[in-house]
Amino acid sequence: MTELKNDRYLRALLRQPVDVTPVWMMRQAGRYLPEYKATRAQAGDFMSLCKNAELACEVTLQPLRRYPLDAAILFSDILTVPDAMGLGLYFEAGEGPRFTSPVTCKADVDKLPIPDPEDELGYVMNAVRTIRHELKGEVPLIGFSGSPWTLATYMVEGGSSKAFTVIKKMMYADPQALHALLDKLAKSVTLYLNAQIKAGAQAVMIFDTWGGVLTGRDYQQFSLYYMHKIVDGLLRENDGRRVPVTLFTKGGGQWLEAMAETGCDALGLDWTTDIADARRRVGNKVALQGNMDPSMLYAPPARIEEEVATILAGFGHGEGHVFNLGHGIHQDVPPEHAGVFVEAVHRLSEQYHR
């Protein structure tokens, strides 16, 4: 494989020295970029874009042409795994993702296959291989998956939810069915991420977008337990390099200590967690990624720079920080504001790495 020219991101995740704090943005390939909108229009719809390796590669690379980002992230969707299980994924205009056959009981769970990542999800692996080839070693490629709990919310609710009453009803009234589903998803996600690593992903991230809707006890049993199983089953070395793993639970700031015990290399922080506090609590165990409020990118450039400086000062000197937003970039953010953000991270972080 091509020699990696910029390994700042991988080094920071492993808490090794870097010259400046590395930065990338969740959803950096996305609708805030006019070139993304053009490519998506060419693809026809969102899943067609995900399933076309050349177009998925093109949108993955678009933000790297604009900004000096320190990592690329595979352009895909967290719902590829449930889609490959045959739930009939489709996108409703203005409604987001929906499934034609949601999971309602243990019998439904028993019928679900564990998808073969090189078969039903082969299009994702083709995209990973294509992107790795086209990156030419400029920056590392991040692979990802949704967490079992987060995938289960969509599969049981039949799509997006605000109150999560359907899955919580299953959790409290039929916990065996939900555990069976989460176990099957943990096995599927482990295979899926390992296949991404073999195809060329140099780091992986598990997005637990909806873990924060749970009580502490339920989070441990229904979300963290299954992410821990995945971390235990992941390939941690490939191509002679360690493959770092980041866990991100949105709304999970109160559980960082438990998350750090999973054996992951880094924790993603949303903007509601104070990064100085997070470093005091778990910085001796894991790297931290985050955590500017994505809405800050609506602010004037000087205010964006001020916020970057505040977060850098909060983390302080030393290694183990990957700068990011606290969640995905919003689709109506001015692209030049994202440029201000990336440039500010590199320029203002130098003093913390001398």
From Swiss-Prot:
Pathway(s) the chain acts in: Porphyrin-containing compound metabolism; protoporphyrin-IX biosynthesis; coproporphyrinogen-III from 5-aminolevulinate: step 4/4
Binding site for substrate: R27, Q28, A29, G30, R31, F46, D77, Y154, T209, H327
GO MF term set: uroporphyrinogen decarboxylase activity
Main location: cytoplasm
Residues annotated as site: Transition state stabilizer: D77
InterPro entries: UROD/MetE-like_sf (IPR038071), Uroporphyrinogen_deCO2ase_HemE (IPR006361), Uroporphyrinogen_deCOase (IPR000257)
Subcellular location: Cytoplasm
GO biological process, one term: protoporphyrinogen IX biosynthetic process from glutamate
Alphabetical keyword list: Cytoplasm, Decarboxylase, Lyase, Porphyrin biosynthesis
Similarity annotation: Belongs to the uroporphyrinogen decarboxylase family.
Protein name: Uroporphyrinogen decarboxylase
The organism of origin for this protein: Shigella flexneri
Taxonomic lineage from the root: Bacteria, Pseudomonadati, Pseudomonadota, Gammaproteobacteria, Enterobacterales
Gene from which this protein is expressed: hemE
